[in-house]
Amino acid sequence: GTALSASRLLADIPDPILVWRDAGGAVAWWMLASGTVSGAGFAQATPDWTVVATGDSAASGRQDLYWRNATLGAGYLWRLDGAAVTGTHDLGVLGPQWRIERTGDFNGDGRTDLLFRRDDGLLYLWHMDGGTVLSQGAIGQLGADWQAAGALDTDGDGRDEIVFFNAATREIWLWFLDGFAATA
C-alpha cells in the first residue's frame, strides 16, 4: 500500500489557506506559502453561511473559498487573489440534504472538483471549471460510518483518488475514479 503523511497531503496544495470565522459572521483568511503568510483577507457574512471547503477552482494556482448555507442547501464560490475576492459564482441550491464532502482534482484538469454527499450516503461528483459545472454524475453510495477523509493523487496519473475511512471498523478504502466510475 501507499503510506500517506501530512507533508505528502500538504504537498498537493499549491498555497494552503487558513480560514477563521467568529459567531457574528466575521471571516478572515490567510494564504500560506512556504510556511509564511503571503496574503490575507477579511469579509462579513451572515451566520447561516459557512466556508466548507477550499480549492483552486480555475487552475490559477490560488485557493478559493466554497460557501454553504446549510438551511437552504445553497452553495457559493468566492474566487480569491490573496486578500481580494476577484469573482463570485452562485453554485445553486441542491437542498439541505446535500453537503460538500470533499474537494479534489478528480478528472486531472488542474481545477478543483466537488464531491457531494446526500444524507442517505449517495456520492455525487461535479467536474468544475470555476463556477461552471462541466459534467456531473453519481459515483456510489456508502453507509453512515464511512467518511471521505482525503483526496490525493496516489498513482501519479494527475487525478485525485478519494480516501474513505470507517471510524467503527478502522478500515480505509481508496477509490480510483475514471470519469464517474469508481474502483477500490
What is each residue range found by the language model?
Residues G1-A184:
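Trp/Gly-enriched beta-strand/coil motifs that build multi-repeat beta-propeller-like domains
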